[in-house]
Amino acid sequence: MFSGRFTVCLFFVLSGFVLSLRYLGVVAAGNPDLGASIAKRTFRLAGLLLTTATLGYVLMCADLFFNNEVAAVTGSSPWFSYMWATDLSLGAFLHILVFDAFSKTDVLNPPLWTIGYELYGSFLTFGLLLFFRKTRLRFIAYAAALVLLQGSYYQCFVLGLFLADIYQNVSGAREWLSRPAVGASFLIAGLLLAGSPAYLPPEALDQSAYGFLPQLDMLGGGYSTLGAVLVLLGTIGSAWLHRFLTRPAIAFLGTISFALYSSHMLVQGSFTSWLFLLLLERVGYDGSALLATMASLVVMFPAAWLLWRWVDVPAIRLSSWVGVQFLARVQSKSKA
């Protein structure tokens, strides 16, 4: 079993890595391209955030969330019952959407708490690249950022940047990571740490398989982040994993992953919960849980595809246009 926090940490570490790659190495893109990436980042993330937050508000107003009733049956309080617990007026909703979209929309759609980290973590990554990527002091800057941000999820982005720098600039790093024994060792160790529980009382944690591990409070995300780093190290040099991850079905999941992540909890809190309660007295707890889960997958994937097609793709096009306009403005000023 993987901890849910592990997937979040992997997402953040991978973001720092991927966002940095093209700005490091021998043929790195220049500062104008980096500026364009900064300019368009907000637009890239805003489409699905604003849309799914609005969907969450509509479902709240229509009283179509059944998470409280499900939490009482399953014992998943307070986690599940705390969701959508805020009674928002239309004015308060619009205020959040206009002024606090990247900090408070999680009251409308809980997974959106990560998107604020993603935006500002991206800016942190781009800022470090802008000021330090061409200097020999950049690794000192990375270390300083890790110290200043200790205990924060923003460390994940710095770690991703650090790994990208090593991968692009350190001689022999790619060859070493491509060795099957090295990659497999990192991957196995990372997957073992991926199960480290995020939220357990100390006495329960001590009795788990991870109870012998010392506290890792200085690292945001703890062992979930460490596991994410190791999984990335075990993946980037693996030829067979690259072939697997580029298969059509896996590539499709990657294409709709942002839309799926942004919408899955809305489905679970509404349709899944409603269907579970409807079936509970008819087929029992286990049967209703299984059938509701299977039916939810039938809803989630088409919904994610629709959001990708009609929201995410236009957001990508808009952000690309913003980047092109930024570069055109820079070029026109340089010629003046």
Residue ranges of predicted features:
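Membrane-interface helix-loop-helix regions
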Residues: 1, 46-119, 123, 230
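Juxtamembrane transmembrane-helix termini
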Residues: 7-41, 48-68, 161-167, 267, ...
